From Swiss-Prot:
Function: Catalyzes the conversion of N5-carboxyaminoimidazole ribonucleotide (N5-CAIR) to 4-carboxy-5-aminoimidazole ribonucleotide (CAIR).
One function term, GO molecular function aspect: 5-(carboxyamino)imidazole ribonucleotide mutase activity
Note: Was identified as a high-confidence drug target.
Cited NCBIfam families: purE (TIGR01162)
Listed pathway(s): Purine metabolism; IMP biosynthesis via de novo pathway; 5-amino-1-(5-phospho-D-ribosyl)imidazole-4-carboxylate from 5-amino-1-(5-phospho-D-ribosyl)imidazole (N5-CAIR route): step 2/2
PANTHER family assigned to the protein according to its UniProt record, in alphabetical order: PHOSPHORIBOSYLAMINOIMIDAZOLE CARBOXYLASE, PHOSPHORIBOSYLAMINOIMIDAZOLE CARBOXYLASE CATALYTIC SUBUNIT
HAMAP family on file: PurE_classI
Amino-acid positions noted as binding substrate in the UniProt annotation, renumbered to this chain: S16, D19, R46
Protein name: N5-carboxyaminoimidazole ribonucleotide mutase
Biological classification of the source: Bacteria, Bacillati, Actinomycetota, Actinomycetes, Mycobacteriales
Entry's EC annotation: 5.4.99.18
Origin species: Mycobacterium tuberculosis (strain ATCC 25618 / H37Rv)
Length: 174
């Protein structure tokens, strides 16, 4: 994830390695913008002391944002947010039961004073992009890359619209 010698700026953590298929999208979004990241399994329930140590030391290690994914009870994002001054982005990971709705509700229902920015169920890619935007707020070069990314998205939509109009035109003329 992080090229040799570069300090990670974003932590991508999850409660279990089984969350990686979802959380890999966050890592991919960060990599697309050349944002160095570290990826770790940090369980709120199985390794609470390690989780608190990770969260408390994150800023000193140079992290600027933490993306935390969890399923089920999904306490990881909130507990990390309680232990760090850094922004935390929560990713509800869908499990076999309730399709991630339980995780979403757990992550968004934070008490006053302990904010967790929350993306959609399984929305780790958007979590990565949100972290990029947070970092880009103070970095004009990164902000320019974000604008270029948005322009590419708009171009894709325009191309799809043109193709749909072409196909629909054939259907309505026949």
């Amino acid at each position: 994830m992080t090229p040799a010698g570069e300090r990670p700026r974003v932590g991508v953590i999850m409660g279990s390695d089984s969350d990686w298929p979802v959380m890999a999208d966050a890592a991919a979004a960060l990599a697309e913008f050349d944002i160095p990241a570290e990826v770790r399994v940090v369980s709120a329930h199985r390794t609470p002391e390690a989780m608190f140590s990770y969260a408390r030391g994150a800023a000193e290690r140079g992290l600027e944002v933490i993306i935390a994914g969890a399923g089920g009870a999904a306490h990881l994002p909130g507990m990390v947010a309680a232990a760090t001054p850094l922004p935390v982005i929560g990713v509800p990971v869908p499990l076999g039961r309730l399709d991630g709705l339980d995780s979403l509700l757990s992550i968004v229902q934070m008490p006053a004073g302990v904010p967790v920015a929350t993306v959609s169920i399984g929305g780790a890619g958007n979590a990565g992009l949100l972290a990029v935007r947070m970092l880009g707020a103070a970095n004009p070069q990164l902000r320019a890359r974000i604008v270029a990314f948005q322009d590419r998205l708009a171009d894709v939509v325009a191309a799809k619209d043109a193709e749909l109009q072409r196909l629909a035109g054939k259907l309505t003329r026949d």
